[in-house]
């Protein structure tokens, strides 16, 4: 199932672009350009989710955009990353 997770972009004047995902504490990435950031952010998120699945952790539902805006403010830049997440089926 494709899930869309919101990343919050950070960029200081003399730094690369950084991104963090509010739904996954500790999942961060960087890129020297926005295009590089998109690639690296998707890889980081996939790796983070794979680790959670391997550890038997539940994958959170994506936050809703208005909730992220309320928490982190409108002045931030955001990036939405689509990730295929396998659903757990309990038999």
Task: Label each PLM-derived region with a short phrase.
Residues 5, 17, 27-29:
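Structural detector for hydrophobic anchor residues on beta-strands
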Residues 13, 25, 87-89:
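Residues that cap or initiate secondary-structure elements
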Residues 25-35:
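A short, exposed loop/beta-hairpin motif centered on an aromatic-Gly-Thr core
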Residues 9-22:
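Short aromatic-glycine-(Arg/Gly/Cys) micro-motifs in beta-strand/loop hairpins
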């Amino acid at each position: 199932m494709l899930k869309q997770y919101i990343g919050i972009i950070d960029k200081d004047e003399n730094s690369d672009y950084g991104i963090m995902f509010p739904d996954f504490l500790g999942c961060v990435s960087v890129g020297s350009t926005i295009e590089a950031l998109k690639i690296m952010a998707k890889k980081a998120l996939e790796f983070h989710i794979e680790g959670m699945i391997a550890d038997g952790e539940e994958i959170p539902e994506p936050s809703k955009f208005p909730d992220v805006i309320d928490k982190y403010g409108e002045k931030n830049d955001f990036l939405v990353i689509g990730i295929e997440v396998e659903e757990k089926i309990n038999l």
